[in-house]
Amino acid sequence: MNCSPPGSSTDTERQSSSSGTPVAPRPTLAPTHPLRQANRLPIRLLKMLTAHTGHLLHPEYLQPLSSTPVSPIELDAKKSPLALLAQTCSQIGKPDPPPSSKLNSVTSSGLSEKESGRSSSLKLGESPLEDKSSFKPYSKGGESRKESGSSSGGAADKAGFRVPSGSCQPFPHAPSPSSRVSSPGQHCDSKNNESQEKKEPEANKANSETSQVNPTLTRASTSNSSAESSQSGDVTPISKADPPSLGSGHVAPVSPYKPGHSVFPLPPSGIGYHGSIVGAYAGYPSQFVPGLDHTKTSLVGNQLPGTLGLPGKPPSSSPLTGASPPSFMQGLCRDPYCLSYHNASHLGSSSCSTCVHDPSALKSGYPLVYPSHPLHSVHTTLSSSVTPSLPGHPLYTYGFMLPNDPVPHICNWVSASGPCDKRFSTSEELLAHLRTHTALPGADKLLAGYPTSTLGSAASCHLHLPPAGPGSPNTLPGSLSLRSPHSLGLSRYHPYGKGHLTTPSGLPLPSLPAGSYYSPYALYGQRLTSASALGYQ
């Protein structure tokens, strides 16, 4: 198949060779001539193939079609079900446009982006009046406000929670807000002080609105690079280089990956809060809550970023950044009975058992507030806030291994009267003490009903029951009449098991002592005591 036009030189040579008579050559067309280009075979094939495809939907189905449709089917291409479905799918995730037109929606979205960009350039004390500071967890990094840093590179945009306007506004639960503004414990700038007086009613309104939603979410994740190294000699819990200028009612965050200050509110040290503070902080013993000394935060600022930081990751890449102590400690160890803390060697000191009676501030080396069991917090709330209810160090209520502790083994049993918290020097004494807690009423009669001694020894081994005998001092008197050998499962609760415990109709179901529960760790006493010594990774 020849791709050259009829007037080319190849046709002339073929005709002269076939007929033998010379033929006058035709005038040769230039290669770029339109007539010659139109006769080329690829152009012809493309025209033939595209002649009957005008009625099909174009790939760009959302674009306006040509003004001269090839076929009448193309007239309703925008109204076809496939095109409507494609348009609907393309609108998923977009905000609802106003009823006027799409052009207005585009311009309004552009204006809202400008407004958010303008508000991001404002400082904390200069927020506009129309901003109600609602909690926006999905706000982008550009929409969060910039912190007013003292140094040049000390402030940066940080995606986090929106803070109520003004960095020094009073917490609504604390009394006398006007005295809080003029207290010497707040190193606010003059600009922030002026804006505070103007915006105090709005700050109270916004703060109360936000705290009604969730009191634990009214905190800001601030980023400052110079707050760790610069510490002043004041007695207030802030340093002079901190941008947010938090008052004495705010506690430094227990975030191991980034130094700085979070804004979860607590009462100042002058206010004698007894027991727990508000809902989310009920798990904290009252003697640690009232204040933190910023000169004692060496563990938060220096030790934890080096020891707990993940290798190869920047300090701000952790999901725990800026978190409050409950989520931080549950993220590190999700077990409420966790017996060790793998940085405990930095925490131990020779005077650890003598520094627990000061409710105003934590002593040196103990800036962290460890969460305790909820039952223990109830017991601590009922007890005096000045005299701790624990014989040992109250930060380590569940057997934290201190290197200089002469009696490191602590009983973790919690009942209605509070935690036991007795200390023992050896694990054998602790296990012998645990058997007094786990003794079932009438256990001697229960074990005496079985003929084989192997079953009784296995039950006393796994359930920590005392050996059967009439003179056993640990057993409690009581009637325990059970009909099936499944009664050994009395100490455990099986949610999916069948009800094997059938009692006679005249006898009530025997139960454990009132108010106490069976500790799952009583079965693993040896493992726990050895794990606390080994670090329990």
From Swiss-Prot:
Xref: Gene3D superfamilies: Classic Zinc Finger (3.30.160.60)
Family: Belongs to the Elbow/Noc family.
InterPro entries, A to Z: Elbow/Noc_ZnFinger, Tscrpt_rep_NocA-like, Znf_C2H2_type
Any one GO molecular-function label of the UniProt entry: zinc ion binding
Pfam families xrefs: nlz1 (PF12402)
Gene designation: znf703
Protein name: Zinc finger protein 703
Classification of source organism: Eukaryota, Metazoa, Chordata, Craniata, Vertebrata
Mapped zinc finger ranges (C2H2-type): 409-437
Location, primary (coarse class): nucleus
Gene Ontology CC: one annotated term: nuclear matrix
